[in-house]
C-alpha cells in the first residue's frame, strides 16, 4: 500500500494569496492546483493557462518543519517495524533542487528524517541494546554479509552536534521496548546506483576513484533479492550512526549544475536493518527500513549539462521513467488487469521490487518534493509520475472534504423519491458508465504513456546524436590543436637545431683554441725544463767556484799566517839582537847567517772576489792565531 505525500519547498507566498506560491496553490491539506505560467511549454502549446489538480495523502506547506514531516510519514513506519518487524520504505521524488536530500538528511540544526529515525530507534531499544556476545552471534549467522564495526570507518571523524527532539516527543510517538528476553542490534548499509550500476559507498575507492560494481542475488530463504557483498556496519549508538551518515554524504557523487548548486548524480539507498534476538533460544528475526533519496529529474536545456553530466542525467531520467511505468503497471494490476511490470529495465526498480517493497510485501510512503518557483513543466511531469499510484492510495487523512462524487449527489437528491428500484437501476447505469469511462481513461493513459515513451526515445536519440556531434566537434578541435602544437614543436625544434649548430661551431673554434693553448703550454713546459737544467748547471758551477774560492782563501790565509809568523820572528830577533850586531857579524862563523826577508809579492788570485754574503768571516780565517800588533809590523 503506497501513500503519497507532497512537500512544498520553502518559499515566500505570492502577494495576492497566502496559500499561493508561484505556479502552485495549496487548496487544503491534501490537494494542490498547478497553473501554467506564460513562459512554460504547456502554456505555449495550449496558448492559454492550463490548470492541473493533484491530490495527496497529506500536503506539507513551506512553513512545515522537519519534525512535522518525520512525525507524519516516517514515525508510523518506524513504529510498525519495531512492533511487527515489518519491512518499510520511504523514498523521495522530485526535480533537481526541490529539497529531497534536505528532507532526508538536512543540516545539523534541522536534521532530516534519517537522523530522527535513528534517534527514535535507539530511544525505543534503550536498555535492550545487543551485547558483544549477541553481536558475535549475529556475525556468525550472517556469513554471506560483510559485517564490520563502525570504528573502521570513523577514525579521525569529528563529532556531530545534531539537534534532536526531547524524550517526551519520542515517548508519545514510539513504544518503549520492555521485553527482557530480547536484545536489538542496528546495522547500516549504504548503496549508490550510478549510471544504472550498484556500488557500496563504504567500499574504499581505488587510486583512480573507482569502486567495484555489485550485483543483486536472491536470498536462500525467500524470493527477495539483496545486494551481494555490501558491507553492513554495526552501530552501537547514535553518535556512530550520525558520523557514518556524514561520511557517506561526503562520498556520494554530486556536482553543480545551472538548476542546482549541489546536484546528486546518483540514487542513494540507506538501509537500516533491525535485528531482534532472543537471548534464551538464540533465535532472531529482522526487518529492514529503507530510506531512498532518488536523484532529481532534470532537462538538459535548463541544467545546461554536457559530456559526462549529460550521460548521468540521461541515466537518471531513464531510471525514473522506468519507475513511473512500474507504478502505472502496479496501479493497473491493483484494478484486476493483467499487466507486466517492467522492473528489470532498471537496477533501481529491480532492487525496489525484488526487495519486497513495491510488490506489496512492505509499507511504502512516497514523498514528492516540488519547487513552486522552478520549472513548471518539470514539476508537472513529477506530478504525473506520482499520479500513477493514485489508484492504490488509501483515503485521504482529512475525510471532511468539500467535494462529493456524482453518485453520492444523486443519492442525496433521490432521498425524497419513493422508487428505490428506479434509483438502483439508475445507479447501476452510472456505475457501468463510470466503468466504461475508466476503461477509456486507462486506454488513453496507456496511449499517452506509449506516446510519451516514443517521444522520450526520440529525444534520447536526438540527444545522443547531439552528444556525438559535440564529441566530433571536440575531437576535431582537439586534432587541430594537436596539429598546431606539433607545428609549434617543429618550429621550436628547428630553432633549437640552429642553436645547436651554432654552439657546435663555437665549440669547434674553442676546441682549436684549446689545442693551440695546450701546445703553447707544452712549449712553455719545455722551456721551463731547459731553464731548470741550466739553473742546475749554473748552481753546480757556482758551487765549484765557491769551493775553489774557499780553497784559495784558506791558502791565502795560510800564506798570510806564515808571513805574519816570519815577521814576528824577525821582530823578535831585532829586539834580542841589535841591528848593528846583526850588520857587523854577517861573516861570523859562530853566528847564524840570517838573510833579510825579501818583500812579499802580491799574489793575484784568478778567482772572482766573493760577495759579502758569501765571504767567510774574519774570525773563521784568523781563528787560532796570535793577536798581532799592526803598528809593530
Curated annotation (Swiss-Prot):
Its main location: nucleus. It is found in: Nucleus; Cytoplasm, Cytoskeleton, Microtubule organizing center, Spindle pole body; Cytoplasm, Cytoskeleton. ATP binds at residues 94-101. One of its GO terms (cellular component) is microtubule. Residues 1-392 form the Kinesin motor domain. Kinesin-like motor protein involved in anaphase B spindle elongation. Belongs to the TRAFAC class myosin-kinesin ATPase superfamily. Kinesin family. This is Kinesin-like motor protein 9.
Amino acid at each position: 500500500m503506497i501513500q503519497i505525500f507532497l512537500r512544498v519547498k520553502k518559499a515566500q507566498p505570492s502577494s495576492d494569496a497566502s496559500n499561493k506560491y508561484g505556479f502552485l496553490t495549496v487548496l487544503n491539506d491534501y490537494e494542490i492546483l498547478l497553473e501554467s505560467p506564460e513562459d512554460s511549454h504547456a502554456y505555449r502549446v495550449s496558448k492559454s493557462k492550463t490548470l492541473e489538480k493533484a491530490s495527496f495523502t497529506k500536503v506539507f506547506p513551506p512553513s512545515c518543519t522537519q519534525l512535522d514531516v518525520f512525525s507524519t510519514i516516517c514515525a508510523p513506519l518506524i513504529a510498525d517495524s519495531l512492533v511487527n518487524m515489518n519491512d518499510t520504505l520511504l523514498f523521495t521524488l522530485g526535480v533537481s533542487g526541490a529539497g529531497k536530500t534536505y528532507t532526508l538528511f538536512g543540516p545539523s540544526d534541522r536534521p532530516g528524517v534519517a537522523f530522527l529515525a535513528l534517534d527514535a530507534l535507539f530511544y525505543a531499544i534503550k536498555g535492550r541494546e545487543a551485547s558483544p556476545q549477541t553481536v558475535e552471534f549475529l556475525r556468525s549467522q550472517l556469513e554471506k554479509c560483510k559485517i564490520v564495526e563502525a570504528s573502521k570507518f570513523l577514525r579521525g571523524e569529528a563529532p556531530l552536534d545534531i539537534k534532536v527532539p526531547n524524550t517526551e516527543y519520542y515517548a508519545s510517538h514510539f513504544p518503549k521496548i520492555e521485553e527482557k528476553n530480547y536484545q536489538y542490534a542496528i546495522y547500516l548499509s549504504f548503496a549508490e546506483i550510478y549510471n544504472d550500476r550498484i556500488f557500496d559507498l563504504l567500499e574504499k575507492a581505488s587510486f583512480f576513484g573507482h569502486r567495484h560494481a555489485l550485483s543483486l542475488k536472491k536470498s536462500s530463504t525467500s524470493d527477495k533479492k539483496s545486494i551481494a557483498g555490501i558491507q553492513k556496519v554495526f552501530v552501537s549508538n547514535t553518535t556512530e550512526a550520525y558520523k557514518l551518515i556524514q561520511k557517506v554524504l561526503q562520498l556520494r557523487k554530486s556536482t553543480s549544475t545551472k538548476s542546482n548548486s549541489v546536484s546528486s548524480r546518483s540514487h542513494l539507498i540507506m538501509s537500516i536493518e533491525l535485528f531482534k534476538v532472543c537471548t534464551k533460544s538464540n533465535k532472531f528475526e529482522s526487518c529492514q527500513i529503507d530510506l531512498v533519496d532518488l536523484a532529481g529529474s532534470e532537462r538538459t536545456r535548463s541544467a545546461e549539462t554536457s559530456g559526462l553530466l549529460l550521460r548521468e542525467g540521461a541515466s537518471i531520467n531513464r531510471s525514473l521513467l522506468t519507475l513511473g511505468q512500474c507504478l502505472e503497471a502496479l496501479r493497473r494490476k491493483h484494478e484486476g488487469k493483467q499487466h507486466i511490470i517492467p522492473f528489470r529495465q532498471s537496477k533501481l526498480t529491480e532492487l525496489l521490487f525484488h526487495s519486497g517493497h513495491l510488490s506489496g510485501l512492505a509499507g511504502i510512503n512516497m514523498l514528492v518534493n516540488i519547487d513552486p518557483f522552478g520549472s513548471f513543466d518539470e514539476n508537472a511531469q513529477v506530478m504525473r509520475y506520482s499520479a500513477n499510484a493514485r489508484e492504490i492510495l488509501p483515503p485521504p487523512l482529512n475525510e471532511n472534504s468539500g467535494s462529493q462524487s456524482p453518485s453520492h449527489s444523486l443519492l442525496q437528491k433521490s432521498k425524497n423519491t419513493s422508487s428505490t428500484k428506479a434509483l438502483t437501476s439508475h445507479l447501476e447505469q452510472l456505475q457501468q458508465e463510470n466503468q466504461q469511462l475508466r476503461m477509456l481513461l486507462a486506454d488513453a493513459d496507456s496511449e499517452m504513456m506509449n506516446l510519451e515513451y516514443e517521444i522520450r526515445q526520440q529525444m534520447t536519440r536526438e540527444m545522443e546524436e547531439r552528444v556525438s556531434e559535440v564529441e566530433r566537434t571536440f575531437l576535431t578541435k582537439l586534432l587541430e590543436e594537436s596539429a598546431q602544437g606539433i607545428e609549434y614543436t617543429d618550429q621550436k625544434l628547428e630553432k633549437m637545431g640552429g642553436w645547436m649548430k651554432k654552439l657546435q661551431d663555437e665549440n669547434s673554434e674553442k676546441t682549436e683554441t684549446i689545442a693551440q693553448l695546450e701546445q703553447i703550454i707544452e712549449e712553455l713546459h719545455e722551456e721551463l725544463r731547459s731553464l731548470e737544467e741550466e739553473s742546475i748547471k749554473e748552481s753546480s758551477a757556482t758551487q765549484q767556484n765557491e769551493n775553489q774560492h774557499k780553497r784559495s782563501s784558506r791558502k791565502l790565509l795560510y800564506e798570510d799566517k806564515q808571513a805574519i809568523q816570519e815577521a814576528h820572528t824577525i821582530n823578535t830577533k831585532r829586539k834580542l839582537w841589535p841591528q848593528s850586531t846583526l850588520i857587523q857579524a854577517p861573516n861570523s862563523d859562530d853566528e847564524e847567517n840570517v838573510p833579510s826577508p825579501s818583500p812579499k809579492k802580491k799574489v793575484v788570485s784568478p778567482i772572482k772576489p766573493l760577495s759579502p754574503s758569501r765571504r767567510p768571516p774574519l774570525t773563521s780565517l784568523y781563528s787560532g792565531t796570535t793577536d798581532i800588533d799592526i803598528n809593530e809590523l
